[in-house]
Amino acid sequence: MARPSRDLAAAERFWVAGLGLTVLFRAEGGGEPGAHDLLMVGHPDASWHLELVHGGDHPVDPRPTDEDLLVLYLDGPVPQELVDRLLDHGGTRVASPNPYWNEWGVTVEDPDGYRLVLCRRGWSNS
């Protein structure tokens, strides 16, 4: 998933120090046409990552909506210490307009306003 970011350092604090993801790749764009700063975070053995971009010739401000959600299914209680760590690293706890997410999880906005849902339900694609 790729998203624009206003501040890659703030995004890194939230996703890495807050959520516990790993920096997989980082690049500074420099002054070349089409170049931008890039931060990729995720789990080293996962088949997905978040690609956060900033700057470039045509910078794009983040434009999240209340339904732009990244949902993590924890298959158990949402640890309060995880929520506290996300809040301590730039997150904001918010209520979801969808009552399902309020019943089954905790929603936290990242520094760019995108929403992360920590859901206590389980999920499997198999």
Predicted regions and their residues:
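Vicinal oxygen chelate
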Residues: 3, 83-126
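Short hydrophobic/aromatic beta-strand element in the GNAT-like acyltransferase core
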Residues: 38-40, 71, 105-107
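Core segments of cupin and vicinal oxygen chelate
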Residues: 3-47
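Short amphipathic alpha-helices within nucleic acid-binding modules
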Residues: 14, 78-85
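N-terminal beta-strand motif that seeds the catalytic metal site of vicinal oxygen chelate
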Residues: 1-13, 25, 69-72, 119-126
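Short glycine-enriched loop/turn motifs at secondary-structure junctions
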Residues: 63-67, 99-100
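Short, charged/polar surface micro-motifs in flexible loops or helix N-caps
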Residues: 44-49, 57-59, 76-80
